[in-house]
Regions:
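Short alpha-helical linear motifs
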Residues: 246, 337-343, 491-496, 503-507
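An exposure/low-complexity boundary signal
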Residues: 496-520
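A contiguous, mid-protein "functional segment" used to position or interact
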Residues: 472-501
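Formylglycine-dependent sulfatase
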Residues: 1-448, 453, 462-483, 511-520
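Residues forming the ATP-binding cleft of Hanks-type serine/threonine protein kinase domains
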Residues: 459
Length: 520
């Protein structure tokens, strides 16, 4: 059971230290499993981050570099790997994947065929596929209407798009509709009760999938749409939390005056300007925290369902997020850059097997990355791991309490910000808006194509306020981190059509075929 929340910051759970936002059900999962303290995504953007989770490959390896960029048809995903082992793989909720229509057309594959459905839904059975952003009633890249809307219509919520008009809108004092798209309404209750919300609906559908699959091996990706915007929570979650329970805003004037061109462009884009206002932050956080609390309560329902069905003792459960949320920290909104608020995520893995008894309830400080999950899943079901494709490492040795040799001592992330307003501010070409992060325990180094780097001393400046990208005293450190980044990029696995064993075995094919090269 692979559970993902959308845009959930690592530090907005009580088990990760939030003093006021209590998440007892997620905490209970951590007590039964391993809580990873240093988990990072391959890109702090929904689509590319998820594509890395699903493929076990870094962003510029799999090629889905932003939300609107399709995952190439040749990329294998969780569903493709596990299906070979006879495991039903389903998704309930969001994947943010776009079908590679050009690649499908080239191969003569249409979406109305079985293989067309598989390659359109990154290898998953789309049991309840819903990416959660529906200004109209049409599912993007599909002729289908939203099943959540059909369900709401049957419950009596009228109109062609109750997702927009009921579930993600509030009601004013005079009965007027207040749109959830407007951040000013984020602390008002949605027009539906909690039991009819997206989060409750997705939890129900997850339980239905598990019930249907109980007699055969299954893998379910339960991908909650929230706490991603619209930040519209049903009562009583909409105003559970007030300003004295929010984290203090995390920014200072040194950052505001930083004239690094890319960072400055991100601070100047319209989203960041909005979230940098205290009024906006204090309004939005009420809904954001309420949506997280609602997810935790629904996970309590789900875990009880698993307990009652006897599945809590035979189901591996992973809980994580696709990226964080700045919420005005560092003078930024949304995500996309590489501060901890954006690129770091919660990661909890519960393995019911006896081999995991040694690590139950532990907090693991080793670095892990999103790309490590797919090899972990394959390892857990004893399925072959495609080492020539997968760029992550199985976490099973860590879960078993072993001490794996040569474990990674840094993490890597990257962005293609060509779709962001910042590219236009900088007047960059579509292929020039790229940035790469390498982070170890002491330093965080960020390389920007065409611009000077950034460097942060995490030991002495854990808040990431003081940019040392131009410091003469740190030129040697910058060169060392750049070399580390180069090594990581060089180590990408791009020869995906041939295994290392094939290369080794076939290297003398010319002699075997009677071909003579360089013979006197």
């Amino acid at each position: 059971l692979f559970i993902m929340a959308d845009q959930l910051r690592w530090d907005y759970l009580s088990c990760y230290g939030h003093p006021h936002l209590k998440t007892p059900n997620i905490d209970s999962l951590a007590k039964r499993g391993v809580q990873f303290e240093s988990a990072f995504v391959q890109s702090p953007v929904c689509g590319p981050s998820r594509a890395s989770y699903y493929t076990g490959r870094t962003v510029f390896s799999h090629g889905s570099t932003w939300n609107q960029v399709p995952l190439p048809i040749g990329e294998l995903t969780i569903g493709d790997y596990l299906r070979q082992s006879g495991i039903r793989t389903g998704v309930v909720g969001k994947t943010h994947m776009r079908p590679d229509l050009e690649g499908m057309s080239r191969l003569g594959i249409t979406k109305d065929t079985e293989i067309g459905l598989i390659v359109s839904e990154p290898g998953f059975d789309p049991y309840e596929r819903d990416d959660g952003l529906h200004p109209n009633n049409q599912i993007k890249n599909s002729k289908k209407t939203l099943s959540y809307n059909e369900w709401l219509n049957k419950l009596g919520y009228d109109g062609p798009n109750p997702w927009n008009d009921w579930a993600n809108s509030a009601e004013g004092e005079n009965g007027e509709i207040l749109s959830g798209w407007r951040l000013r309404n984020s602390n008002k209750p949605a027009r539906i009760p909690e039991k009819h919300s997206e989060t409750a609906f997705m939890t129900n559908r997850a339980m239905e999938f598990i019930e249907e699959s109980k007699d055969k091996p299954w893998f379910l990706h339960l991908s909650y749409i929230k706490p991603h915007w619209p930040y519209m929570a049903p009562a009583p979650y909409h105003n559970m939390y007030s300003a004295n329970e929010f984290y203090p805003v995390h920014r200072n004037d040194t950052e505001r005056n930083n004239d690094h061109p890319v960072y400055k462009a991100f601070m100047e884009n319209s989203i960041s300007k909005t979230f940098s206002k205290d009024e906006v932050r204090n309004t939005v956080l009420s809904g954001y925290m309420g949506l997280i609390k609602q997810i935790d309560d629904n996970l309590g329902r789900l875990f009880k369902f698993l307990e009652d069905a006897g599945h809590m003792e035979d189901t591996m459960i992973v809980f994580t997020s696709d990226h964080g949320d700045y919420q005005g920290d560092h003078w930024l909104g949304e995500k996309e850059l590489f501060h901890e608020q954006s690129v770091r995520v919660p990661m909890i893995i519960y393995d019911p097997s006896e081999h995991a008894n040694k690590t139950r309830g532990t907090k693991e400080k080793r670095f892990i990355e999103a790309i490590d999950l797919l090899p972990t899943f394959l390892d857990a079901v004893e399925s072959p791991v495609s080492k020539h494709r997968l760029e992550g490492n199985s976490l099973m040795p860590v879960i078993k309490g072993e001490d794996p040799k040569n474990w990674k001592d840094f993490v890597f992330s990257e962005i293609d910000y060509s779709f962001n307003e910042a590219r236009k501010i900088l007047n960059l070409g579509a292929s020039d808006a790229r940035a790469f992060m390498i982070r170890n325990n002491e330093w965080k180094y960020i390389y920007y194509k065409g611009f000077e780097p950034q460097l942060f001393d995490l030991k002495n400046d854990p808040d990431e306020f003081n940019d040392l990208g131009r410091s003469k005293d740190h030129s040697k450190i910058r060169e060392e981190m750049k070399e580390l980044l180069l090594k990581r990029i060089i180590d990408r696995k791009n020869r995906v059509a041939a295994t290392d064993e094939f290369v080794t075995k076939e290297r003398d094919y010319t002699k075997d075929d009677g071909i003579m090269i360089g013979v006197w």
